[in-house]
């Protein structure tokens, strides 16, 4: 079955790319980052290729490659272009597909459209990546409300942080959302340790066979 999943987050730097790499490896999935902001350092596609140990055929080219590491709307403006969401079409593939957003859920693509608006059009099940640190209950519940107000299918929340049982349980209960698991912070972020950590902390059946 051809599975398609969106990986988004409550904030930038939340760990979406590392989680996406682990998920791609576990599912044998193709990875697509529609918008890449910042090209001087290792891009998210390059990080996923390295950590997922994915072949070049499983890393699809970005729809927009922008030079400045900033919000997509600003990065595009500095590059003298405008991101046109209507030109971003979901790639066809016979393999599972993991789509990673840029920054947080409500990051603007241009002066009219947020990433969440694009996800609402696509109607693909989304995984919300969140911390379990102080302040995350508010951030995560607000993100869930924003997703549901747009009828974005929510697969569940994936925590990427040190353990905080009360916070994780509270979010799952008040947010009426599935707690998919928690990816701990790894001192040695090698492909092998990442794959092992994901396998220990998540159930692959929660992700496999999701199709829209």
From Swiss-Prot:
Keywords: ATP-binding, Biotin biosynthesis, Cytoplasm, Ligase, Magnesium, Metal-binding, Nucleotide-binding
Organism of derivation: Brucella abortus (strain 2308)
Assembly mode: Homodimer.
Protein family: Belongs to the dethiobiotin synthetase family.
GO MF term set: ATP binding; dethiobiotin synthase activity; magnesium ion binding
Subcellular location: Cytoplasm
Entry binding sites for substrate: 37
CDD domains: DTBS (cd03109)
InterPro entries: DTB_synth_BioD, P-loop_NTPase
Domain of life per record: Bacteria
UniProt xrefs under Pfam families: AAA_26
Catalysed conversion reaction: (7R,8S)-7,8-diammoniononanoate + CO2 + ATP = (4R,5S)-dethiobiotin + ADP + phosphate + 3 H(+)
List of residues binding Mg(2+): 17, 100
Known cofactor(s): Mg(2+)
Described purpose of this protein according to its UniProt entry: Catalyzes a mechanistically unusual reaction, the ATP-dependent insertion of CO2 between the N7 and N8 nitrogen atoms of 7,8-diaminopelargonic acid (DAPA, also called 7,8-diammoniononanoate) to form a ureido ring.
EC number of this enzyme: 6.3.3.3
GO biological process: one example: biotin biosynthetic process
This protein's GO CC annotations: cytosol
Protein name: ATP-dependent dethiobiotin synthetase BioD
Active site: 33
Pathway, per record: Cofactor biosynthesis; biotin biosynthesis; biotin from 7,8-diaminononanoate: step 1/2
Enzyme kind, highest EC tier: ligase
């Amino acid at each position: 079955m051809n599975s398609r999943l969106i990986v988004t987050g409550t904030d930038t730097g939340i760990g979406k790319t590392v989680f996406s790499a682990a998920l791609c490896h576990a599912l044998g999935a193709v990875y697509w980052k529609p918008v890449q902001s910042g090209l001087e350092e290792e891009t998210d596609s390059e990080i996923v290729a390295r950590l997922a140990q994915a072949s070049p055929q499983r890393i699809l080219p970005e729809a927009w490659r922008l030079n400045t590491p900033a919000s997509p709307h600003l990065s595009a403006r500095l590059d003298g272009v405008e991101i046109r969401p209507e030109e971003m079409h979901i790639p066809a593939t016979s393999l599972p597909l993991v789509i990673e957003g840029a920054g947080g859920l409500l990051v603007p693509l241009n002066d009219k459209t947020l990433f969440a608006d694009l996800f609402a059009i696509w109607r693909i099940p989304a995984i919300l990546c969140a911390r379990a640190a102080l302040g995350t209950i508010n951030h995560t519940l607000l993100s869930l409300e924003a997703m549901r107000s747009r009828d974005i299918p929510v697969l569940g929340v994936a925590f990427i942080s040190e353990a905080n049982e009360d916070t994780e349980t509270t979010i799952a209960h008040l947010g009426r959302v599935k707690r998919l698991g928690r990816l701990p912070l790894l001192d040695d972020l090698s492909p092998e340790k990442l794959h092992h950590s994901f396998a220990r902390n998540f159930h692959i059946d929660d992700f496999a066979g999701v199709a829209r």
